[in-house]
Amino acid sequence: MGLEKSLMLFPLFVLLLGWVQPSLGRESSAQKFQRQHMDPAGSSSNSPTYCNQMMKRRDMTKGSCKPVNTFVHEPLADVQAICSQENVTCKNGKSNCYKSSSALHITDCHLKGNSKYPNCDYKTSQYQKQIIVACEGNPYVPVHFDATV
C-alpha cells in the first residue's frame, strides 16, 4: 500500500519539480546587484590586484571583460537603506534612483586599455563617495548601481 501511494504521488512530484526548478538557477536583480557590487568585508581592497581577483571571483570576466564596476565596502543593510533616502533621476531617465546621504567606502575597477579577454586586467582605485542606486521590488532593494557622486 505504501508503494502504491508513492507511485501515485511521484508524477505530482515530477510536475512540481518541473515548475519550481527553472527558477532555482535564475539570479534575481537584487542577487545580481549583491554579487556584482557588495563586498562588505573589503579586506584586500587596498591591494592593486583586488579588482582582478574580485571581477573573476564574481563572474564578471566570463565571455568578456566587464569594462567598469564598483564594489561597496559597507554592510548590506546600509546600502539597502539608500532606497529610502534622496530620490534622484537615474542616468537612463527613470525615477527609481536614490542617492546615499553620506560617502561610502568603495572600490572602482576600470579595465586597462591594453587588456583583452580572457586576460582581463583592471586598475583598482579606492574612494569615499556618495553612490546612486536604482531600487525595485517588495521589499524595495537596490537592483542596479547607477553612479558615484
Swiss-Prot record:
Domain of life: Eukaryota
Active site location: 37, 144
Keywords: Disulfide bond, Endonuclease, Glycoprotein, Hydrolase, Lyase, Nuclease, Secreted, Signal
Catalyzed reactions per annotation: an [RNA] containing cytidine + H2O = an [RNA]-3'-cytidine-3'-phosphate + a 5'-hydroxy-ribonucleotide-3'-[RNA]; an [RNA] containing uridine + H2O = an [RNA]-3'-uridine-3'-phosphate + a 5'-hydroxy-ribonucleotide-3'-[RNA]
A Gene Ontology biological process term: defense response to Gram-positive bacterium
Organs and tissues of expression: Pancreas.
Keyword hit for Glycoprotein: yes
Glycosylation positions in this chain: 87
The protein's Enzyme Commission number: 4.6.1.18
Cystine residue pairs: 51-109, 65-120, 83-135, 90-97
Sequence segments annotated as region (Disordered): 30-49
Subcellular location: Secreted
Function field: Endonuclease that catalyzes the cleavage of RNA on the 3' side of pyrimidine nucleotides. Acts on single-stranded and double-stranded RNA.
Subunit architecture: Monomer. Interacts with and forms tight 1:1 complexes with RNH1. Dimerization of two such complexes may occur. Interaction with RNH1 inhibits this protein.
Listed name of the protein: Ribonuclease pancreatic
Gene that produces this protein: Rnase1
